[in-house]
Amino acid sequence: MSSIVLPCPSCRIDNPTPAQQLLSRPRCQRCQQALTVNTPIETTREAIDGVIRSAPLPVLLVFYSQWSAPSTMAAPVLLQVAQRHAGRLLVLRINTDMNPDVMKRYGVTAMPALILFRGGSERKRLQGAHSAVEIEQLLSDGAASR
């Protein structure tokens, strides 16, 4: 079972949460505060495939690098996207500086790269810096593709 780590907004501890439980209103293991998925969540190469396959909602996988100015500029836009689509989209981030092999595995050649998955399959992708409007179009086009 693949899990992602959701930080508690109240007590700040990390809560490993199975991807299948994201829609069942998970709660913090310590304080029982509701855990919301309304920000991009950092992930690892070990968790990516399992989460993409088992998540009950579409997954936007964001490849970024700390040294990349376009990645830094995209961060606030991706936060807005995650907040706007909370409960309907899971936004995951993978740091390619710490996980360089994932770029090759997913055919990523520019930062940031966004790949939309639904039902475990890739639907659409964008590479390089893009506006909020272009990211929303990616989500809309990806929702329409079957």
Q: Model-found features: residue ranges?
A:
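Short cysteine-rich clusters marking metal-coordination/redox-active sites
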Residues: 8-11, 28-31, 71
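A short beta-strand-turn-helix
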Residues: 14, 40-59
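Cys/His-rich microdomains that often coordinate metals
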Residues: 15, 35, 75
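Short linker/helix segments within small regulatory modules
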Residues: 17-26
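Thiol-based oxidoreductase modules, predominantly thioredoxin-like and allied folds used
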Residues: 42-43, 63, 78-82, 86-101
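Structural micro-motif
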Residues: 55-59, 106-115
